[in-house]
Amino acid sequence: MTERALSRLEVPAPAPKPRNAGMTMFTDLGCGLHEQEDRMQIAGDFVDLAKLATSMVSTLPKEIIRKKVELYRKYGVEAFPGGVQMEHALYAHGMDIADYVFEEMKDLGLRVVEVSDNYLDLTLESKCKLIEKGAKEHGLKILAEAGDEVEETPLEALIHDCQSCKEAGAYKVLLEAAELMDKKTGELKMHYLDAIKDAVGLEHIIFELPWVWLENVHWYQSFSSLAVMVKKLGPEVNLGNIEMSMLVYAQMIRNGAGTKLAKDRQV
């Protein structure tokens, strides 16, 4: 067992991998292998999934992608391609290209693939067929994104999206961060968190944190949303889009000993 300082404080150790709850996903925007190794040496125990951003898989050489996948797996972290990669392929070549893409991902050593419909006008039925194809025909774990990055989805429709993805065989449902934010106030829509948790099941969802690429989102929203979600849903909530430099900090929040926690404690 790893020895930590201040052992009398009894800070909880992360659950052993593979985990089904308390999972952390972050986005790799193209860091080099040395930086990747450094990050994982420090934070690998706390991380479960690493998204290879957008179309990285078709942008970098195969040998680099394979090395990144292997290096993450060394620390018990599964890399996966962002959903834009599949969306771009479908847009350029049609639905029949999906089998080729899934097999190419497996050839790169990937075991997890994201299916999304952020930029491609896929029907829910088509998205679910892709999920089923990837999971049942190709033996992959499919992360299915639910929600829209631009348009606000009514709560009932968003829940239906999540449930449909789960029933189609999704490993986890990635809940689009933009759907969780009130576009006027920038605050989290707390009633969405409760309703989706109750209807779909906390263990089936990865709640994405808002990132600065969303309109009117600044670091404050991403930073504070992390603490709010953990306080609201508990330390076992699955979280996505953690900034790479905040992986250790996210674990501190899960442990109940980070900043941005409510001042409602007494000594």
Language model segments and positions:
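Active-site-adjacent beta->alpha loops and helix N-cap segments on the catalytic face
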Residues: 10-13, 34, 58-71, 90-99, ...
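Histidine/lysine/aspartate-rich catalytic loop segments that bind and position anionic ligands
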Residues: 135, 141-147, 155-156, 162-171, ...
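Conserved N-terminal beta1-alpha1 strand-loop-helix module at the mouth
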Residues: 1-69
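Acidic (Asp/Glu)-rich catalytic clusters
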Residues: 37-46, 63-76, 99-109, 129-137, ...
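C-terminal alpha-helical cap/extension of soluble enzyme domains
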Residues: 5-8, 200-267
